[in-house]
Amino acid sequence: MKKVIFALLILGTVQVQADVAVSNIWSALPGKGSELVQNVMEARAIHEKMGAEVTLFVDHENNIHYVTGFSDWGAWGKFLDSAPNNKEWQEFWQRASEGGAAELSNTFMLEAPVSAKSQPVHMVFSWDVQQGKTPEFLALCQQSKVIHERLGASVGMNVDELANVHYEMSFESWAAYGEFSQKLAADSEWQKFFTAANAQPTAELVKVWRLSRM
């Protein structure tokens, strides 16, 4: 299980009151896909009763992204503190652990200074940002957001515990994403921005997630 180290993030000039989330990415063991789906559905029902906002996605590799959202880190802490004393959760967790349906492949603790609209299709571009360059990179993201939303995307920005940025775009359907991609490729404003941003890059694209809401 991947260990997570939480660090407070300073977002510079683009900092606003941010929602927070923890995203756990689960990979089903062979032949256990249906059991994993059943488990996350049951976990969601319990966690929502405990006060979390839960969203589920399946990615292009058939991993499940189990996202718990909170108004702030204080609310997250209260949720975490309540888990050991929640009988329903403890009984479920023991049963699910013994069943061994999946492995936790990654965990991200995120702040969202800007949130994308909740829609059936989400694209997430994960950027490894150079140390100390997160505010500068977020400023670039704000500029690209204007272009992408003009072309039909809803854009969000998520900053993880290592100050890396996950740039999110959501759409009504995969067809809508395809139409967006065609328009983007032909957009002169985007081409000019993209060329300028890559002249002195401050981040490296390390992962692209194609997510469908469950």
Each PLM stretch: what is its role?
Residues 3-16:
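Sec-dependent N-terminal signal peptides
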Residues 1-2, 206:
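Generic cytosolic/nucleocytoplasmic N-terminal low-complexity/intrinsically disordered segments
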Residues 17-191, 195-214:
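Short S/T/G/P-rich N-terminal loop/turn motif that feeds into the first structured element of a domain
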